[in-house]
């Protein structure tokens, strides 16, 4: 990529694979690599505009959200430690909100034992099974990641997975795949980060109802 653009290596801050896909439209399948280059001096980008017809300039999309200016009286509560709850709690924890997470099922190791027991005996634990417990239903999948191209949340989730031990190629493969064993370790690691940042996770704790007074949570 640097050679095609005639970019000296010392001017590149980063150069790597951004995406790998397969083009099978014309008979024999062809691997198509999309490369991403970040220059140390962004002001020099325009100088390489005509180096190749395949070159385009883009600004990476990153997930961001606005933070209010009123202090919270209580910690935010996240219900469930499935994929949505896990990343909601992670984002809140990284933003300094010390979330309280309520999960009706057990932590991952106990949950795995309960599922193995069910597979052997047929005895179902209503709170520790393939649906409920740390990691949610995805914990017992094979770790395939469904992407939403162009959604900045993709980068946030992918970066979190990479920071917690996922293979580097999930950042650029067309159909990224983590694998069950690695996925479970990643989930534990994310939970540990949430706790380290002041969050709290309460397992075997089900939300059974909400108390409403004057049209608001009491």
Locations of regions flagged by a protein language model:
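A short, glycine/Asx- and small/polar-enriched loop/turn
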Residues: 26-31, 182-186, 211-217
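N-terminal Rossmann-like FAD-binding beta1-loop-alpha1 element of flavoenzymes
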Residues: 71-106
């Amino acid at each position: 990529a640097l050679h095609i653009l005639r970019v000296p290596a010392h001017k590149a801050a980063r150069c790597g694979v951004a995406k790998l896909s397969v083009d099978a439209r014309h008979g024999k399948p062809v691997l198509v690599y999309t490369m991403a280059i970040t220059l140390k001096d962004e002001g020099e980008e325009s100088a390489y505009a005509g180096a190749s017809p395949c070159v385009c300039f883009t600004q990476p999309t990153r997930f961001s959200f606005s933070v209010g200016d009123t202090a919270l009286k209580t910690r935010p509560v996240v219900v469930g430690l499935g994929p949505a709850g896990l990343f909601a709690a992670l984002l809140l924890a990284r933003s300094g909100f010390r979330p309280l997470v309520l999960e009706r099922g057990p932590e991952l190791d106990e949950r795995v034992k309960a599922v193995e027991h069910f597979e052997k005996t047929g005895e179902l634990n209503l709170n520790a099974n393939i649906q409920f417990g740390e990691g949610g239903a995805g914990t017992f999948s094979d770790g395939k990641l469904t992407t939403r191209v162009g959604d900045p949340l993709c980068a946030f989730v992918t970066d979190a997975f990479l920071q917690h031990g996922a293979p580097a190629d999930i950042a650029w493969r067309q159909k990224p795949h983590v694998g069950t064993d690695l996925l479970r370790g990643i989930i534990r690691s994310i939970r540990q980060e949430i706790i380290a940042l002041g969050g709290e996770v309460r397992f075997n704790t089900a939300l059974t109802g909400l108390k409403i007074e004057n049209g608001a949570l009491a």
